[in-house]
């Protein structure tokens, strides 16, 4: 089948199902595609197909992620579902597939379980903007009061992790009943699926487009062009850059250099503007080649500052994933790959009661770099040692 052109007529959102193993995340994903396929807005993707998700590599880490797409009357969705618990952790920390909204699936038969909590904590740490709860398997619980109890527990859990637990939408239903339902879209088994989709359309906020955010471009390379000046190249991470725009060069020291971009070029052609996602060269006014280097960023003035010390949620690779074979303690000094920067840092603090971190752990820690780098909350990074990736992290708070 030929690749269809992606038509941007509707707002696009990235969403995903999260929750404890066997609570029905994948069945719910299948049910959504089945229901929408009756209107020609999705290809029905059965459980087995989603479950054997292909492998992807992100920051040197292998993750299994299934990408499903569908649309409602109002929106276009890219939906991710991960087969294994570790895949969810790795996905959320590396940001392989970021979420504009999450659907937390909780089985009425079990209530919130350990992985439910871990996924909610991660959603908070990586700032998933909104959450909807789907209480699944309600057909297997005879007593409605038990479902009320599960709902109460889930709302309490969400409050604990600073989601609006008292106010956010909770939908009850059976994903399996919808998957097994007839091809009549009015079949009552589809009612909770329709309710979920309507709620997603209304409740998940529309994400800010990358081009509307303040300009930022990590510096990949620096050239000196005789008679013209210094050109830095890189891929624009967010925002827009136009000739004449003032930018700051941030990172490597606490001092921030200001300059003006006098020309933006792509494939040797002069551009009116460079947009998020473009690989460009920016000519900088009055900057010598030795005043800017790989690892720094060009950014809209005042939009990002250099820091050395931050808190992060880190996933430590298992031996089987190519990670370390042994645990590490405070004082461990690996390399941190932050955008294009490659900088040594020290692990200076673990949570209370944690003496050492084992391969396979998912843990919060405080990191101190040997020199300042442009850092912000929600930013992803890799931890490497001796040429191999040993961990992946996301910045949860700036310390200094």
Swiss-Prot record:
Region (G5): 174-176
Locations listed in the record: Cytoplasm
Binding locations of Mg(2+): 26
Annotated stretches, region: G3: 81-84
GO molecular function: GTP binding; GTPase activity; translation elongation factor activity
PROSITE patterns, A to Z: G_TR_1, G_TR_2
Major place of residence: cytoplasm
Protein name: Elongation factor Tu
Gene designation per UniProt: tuf
